């Protein structure tokens, strides 16, 4: 997909907006989030513009996943967090802040107060089965 002239991430890829670059290859760019949740909060993007997971080409998401793994390993080695979250949001209902597919690498420390956890509760198996069937119809 071509670059979007209004996309901040496309402007970063083009060198029009500076970033704290961590890694770059032919298909992806990894850089520090300038509004970090914690030290080490990094973003990984495909260089091509894809708004969401629903739009991204299979080869582009594979490249982004490879780079995400590499950055996660480096963050883990450099900062030694207690854990690490990978976050990828799609659309306003999921709080996607930039309309360019991206992964967040979020190092976590015990007691850091970041709330991305939910409490598992037993689901209704009949309902879960119905939802599974609805999803399978689209595969």
Describe the role of every protein-language-model region.
Residues 1-139:
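HIT superfamily nucleotide-processing domains
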């Amino acid at each position: 997909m071509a670059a979007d002239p209004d996309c901040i991430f496309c402007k970063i890829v083009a060198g029009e907006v500076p970033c704290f670059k961590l890694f770059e290859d032919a298909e992806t760019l990894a850089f520090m989030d300038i509004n970090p949740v914690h030290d080490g909060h990094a973003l990984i993007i495909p260089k091509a513009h894809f708004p969401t997971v629903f739009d991204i080409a299979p080869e582009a998401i594979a490249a982004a996943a490879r780079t995400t793994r590499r950055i996660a390993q480096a963050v883990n080695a450099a900062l030694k967090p207690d854990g690490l979250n990978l976050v990828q949001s799609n659309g306003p209902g999921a709080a996607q802040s930039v309309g360019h597919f991206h992964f967040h690498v979020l190092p976590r420390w015990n007691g850091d107060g970041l709330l991305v956890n939910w409490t598992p509760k037993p689901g209704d198996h009949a309902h879960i089965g119905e939802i599974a069937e609805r999803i399978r119809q689209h595969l």
